[in-house]
Amino acid sequence: MNSSTSTMSEEPDALSVVNQLRDLAADPLNRRAIVQDQGCLPGLILFMDHPNPPVVHSALLALRYLAECRANREKMKGELGMMLSLQNVIQKTTTPGETKLLASEIYDILQSSNMADGDSFNEMNSRRRKAQFFLGTTNKRAKTVVLHIDGLDDTSRRNLCEEALLKIKGVISFTFQMAVQRCVVRIRSDLKAEALASAIASTKVMKAQQVVKSESGEEMLVPFQDTPVEVEQNTELPDYLPEDESPTKEQDKAVSRVGSHPEGGASWLSTAANFLSRSFYW
């Protein structure tokens, strides 16, 4: 009779499930379906209270992706436990500083989804000040670098690029715009953009140029020097920060992941939701 507690070893663990949801949420074409699914959004909320920090980290990345879709924000904000769980992550003393900042940004986006402009601005500034207080002296100012990556044309290349960027100490977050072969990277202010180019060049199949705007507002591609830059290795996963500075818009231009099909994604969401509904009791 007690079948719901049987053979958990045969099912995916929480980290693999949340990582799959994160990867699906990275594709703009999947974001509405994930939020509309009856099990996935509540599951991500429960993941925020998981005792394993990488699970919390991955859940927040997924939520940040989902919040990029404006049509999702009201439903996300109204989902039972969403705002409270984000507050708990921010206020918990054991939460890493950058994870607090990530949770605070998601909270800002959802909280301001139905505010007047003035109220939204004040609320977001207040939340950011609070997050920076939690970060303390370890919080350095971040900057955004937009890269055009020759060779970034399928999922396997994107995975290679992800692995290269994750190894760089000082990379806070990144998001891809596959349709235009771009990557928007948030980095510490003391990290040079050349380090990103060196890491991408190390893949041997991709090469990066920096996207900058001229005084007239036109975009230009600036090549990096071929001289390799020594890259300090990172031992921690970065957290996701917004790509507001991106000079391009991804909406209506995004491509689905290679080999993926809408019906396949729906089937996986159903499997994940089934796992979520039976497994979140710690």
From Swiss-Prot:
Q: Which GO terms describe its cellular component?
A: cytosol; mitochondrial outer membrane; mitochondrion
Show the Gene3D superfamilies listed in the entry: Leucine-rich Repeat Variant (1.25.10.10)
Q: Which UniProt keywords apply?
A: Acetylation, Cytoplasm, Membrane, Mitochondrion, Mitochondrion outer membrane, Phosphoprotein
Ranges for the region named Disordered are 239-261
The places in or outside the cell where this protein is found are: Cytoplasm; Mitochondrion; Mitochondrion outer membrane
* Phosphothreonine modified-residue sites: T137
Signal peptide annotation: none
The answer on whether this UniProt entry bears the keyword Signal reads no
Family matches, as SUPFAM superfamilies = ARM repeat (SSF48371), HMA, heavy metal-associated domain (SSF55008)
Please give the Gene Ontology molecular function terms for this protein. metal ion binding
Q: What is its main location?
A: cytoplasm
Task: Give the N-acetylmethionine positions (modified residues).
Answer: M1
Record-annotated disulphide pairs:
none
Which residue windows does the record flag with biased composition (Basic and acidic residues)? Answer: 246-255
Q: Name one GO biological process term.
A: intracellular distribution of mitochondria
Q: Keyword Mitochondrion: yes or no?
A: yes
Ranges of the ARM repeats in the UniProt entry:
39-81
Q: Which residues carry this modification: Phosphoserine?
A: S189, S246, S260, S267
PANTHER family found in the cross-reference section: ARMADILLO REPEAT-CONTAINING PROTEIN 1
Share what the entry says about its subunit structure, partners included: Interacts with mitochondrial contact site and cristae organizing system (MICOS) complex components IMMT/MIC60 and MICOS10/MIC10. Interacts with mitochondrial outer membrane sorting assembly machinery (SAM) complex components SAMM50 and MTX1.
Instruction: Please describe what this protein does.
Output: In association with mitochondrial contact site and cristae organizing system (MICOS) complex components and mitochondrial outer membrane sorting assembly machinery (SAM) complex components may regulate mitochondrial dynamics playing a role in determining mitochondrial length, distribution and motility.
Q: What is this protein called?
A: Armadillo repeat-containing protein 1
Source organism: Homo sapiens (Human)
